[in-house]
Every structure is written in structure tokens, then in C-alpha cells.
Amino acid sequence: MRYSFHHFLMLTALAFSTLPILGCGGDNNSKSYIPDFKPQPQPTEDYKYAKAPGTIRLMTYNSFYCKSNTDSKIFTEEHTRNFGEVIKALHPDVIAIQELDSACNGRSQRYLLQEIQQAAGDDYNIVFGSAAPYDGGKIGCGVMYKKTLQPTAIRQVALPGHEKRKLILISFPQFNFIGTHLDLETPHRQSSIEQLQHELPTLPNAPVFFAGDLNDSPMWKAEVSAFPKLLQNFTILSATTGSLPDEPNETIDYVLVDKAHQNKVEVKQTHVVKQLYMNGSVKETKTVSDHYPVFVDVKLK
């Protein structure tokens, strides 16, 4: 018994002597053997769409007359402000905007493009393409451009349509920009592209960017699309990941460049903006309009 008890004491002492090594690591280098189970942060999209220095941001965005794409589709200052805040967050250099009204009786005789300009930060000049009479006023498309750009020429060209349409052509020192909203009917869209082609030789020798809600897609059959004509002279620059919230696989909003100058243009990034960081949080843009904003950042060579 004495031998066994002595043996027991020795084993107990040996066991306790190992506890510092097992529990505390035993030396200063032991931490390398202890797994770090602290969760590591995962990379996430910030949805801020920062623009790189030296690039030009071109955008197209259908306003849906700023009545929102919610269950309550009404003309309110809040809905107009929401639309303008999307533009303010993305801060394009030039933007084509569709579905605008001016002096319409049932819409408080507002000048919608001006209200959007004010909501977007007011550092833009505006051009309204007054195209068709409506409710005592006019409807049409428009273009906003940063006041620092200083265009050399601005003009408008009438387009055919069941509802009259316009091309807004603006020449800047380094490039040309054409904004529009094409008709719903195929023959009118095709005729509009022919008119666009007719205007190209009249523009300064610089890249020509064509942007808007084209009510058309290169994915459609040739007989119901204007794209076979359009792609003779233009190349699509913008993302085509679905520009309609209610039709996820359909893209009808585009930014293109003329083929004669496409080698002078480098695309840095392009997005159909479905989520956007605004006013301290990420928000869904599908409730603002029935179209998503589409932009492309380019660098001119």
C-alpha cells in the first residue's frame, strides 16, 4: 500500500506539472499553436459606385414621371425627390432622362425636369425635349449635364412616333451625347434610327454616345427590332443585366458609342443599378421607377 500510495503521489504531481503547458501555452511562442476562431469580415459590395478620376459617367434613367414604382403610383414631391436622390448619389456627368412633363394640368403644371435637377443637387444644366402635347402641356425626354462641361452646341431633332419623340444632341469639347426615348412601335423605332444615322455626319469629329430608353433589344427578332439598323453604326457599352424591375431578364435602356470612334473610348465600369447606397443605407431602386438607372464610366483616349 505504501508503494502504491507513493506511486500515486508521483503520478499526481506529474499530471499537475503539465497543466501550465496545456492551459497557458507554456512559453511566448505557444500562441501560434492556438487556432483563432474569431470570424473574419467578408468582402461586400458597398453599392456606392465610386467613379475613378479622369473618367466620364454617362447614364440613362426613365423617371416613370416620378410617380414611383410602389403600390401608390402618384405624382408627389417625395417621389420626385427620391428619383433625384438616385441621380445625386450616382452623380453622372451627363444623363438622359425619359418620361418628363411640363405644364400639364393634372400634374400641378410642374416642370418636372427642373424639379429633378433641384433634387439632384442643382449643379446641372437641363435640356427638355418637348415632344408631344399632353393635358394642356408637353411631355418628352431630357438631358442633364454638369455645368462644368460647357457644351459647344445643343439642338433637337423630331422623331416619328405614335407619340411624338425627340433626339437631343449636345456637343461637348471632347465628345457628343444624344439622348432619346424611342417609340413603342417597331416601324417608328426603325425610322428613328435612320434619322439618327442621318445626323451623325453633322456632329463634330469626336465620340458619339447614344443613350436612352430605346423600347427595344438586340435579343428580339430582327423583324420587330431596330437594333439591326442601330448596330450598323453603334456598339453597346452599358451593362445588359435587366433594366426593368418587373421584367428581370429584359434590357431596353442603353448607352452606346459610334463605331467610328469606339477605339477612342475605354470602358472602366458599367452597371444596371439595382441597389444603391443613399442617405446612410443601401436601398432598392426598384421602388423609385419602373426602370433601373443604367450607367457607364468611360475614359477618352
PLM region descriptions:
Residues 22-118, 133-134, 290, 299-301:
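N-terminal, active-site-proximal structural segment of metallo-dependent hydrolase catalytic domains
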Residues 1-10:
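Bacterial N-terminal signal peptides that target proteins for export
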Residues 56-63, 83-109, 144, 177-180, ...:
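Active-site beta-strand/loop signature of hydrolases that rely on acidic residues for catalysis
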Residues 65-68, 102-105, 136, 185-187, ...:
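Active-site environment of divalent metal-dependent phosphoester hydrolases
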Residues 55-70, 155, 169, 174-183:
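Active-site-proximal beta-strand elements of phosphoester/diester hydrolases
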Residues 27-46, 155, 200-209, 216-301:
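Metal-dependent phosphoester-hydrolase catalytic domains
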Residues 33-50, 100-175, 269-273:
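Structured beta-strand-rich core segments of catalytic domains in phosphoester-bond hydrolases
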Residues 10-20:
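Bacterial N-terminal signal peptides
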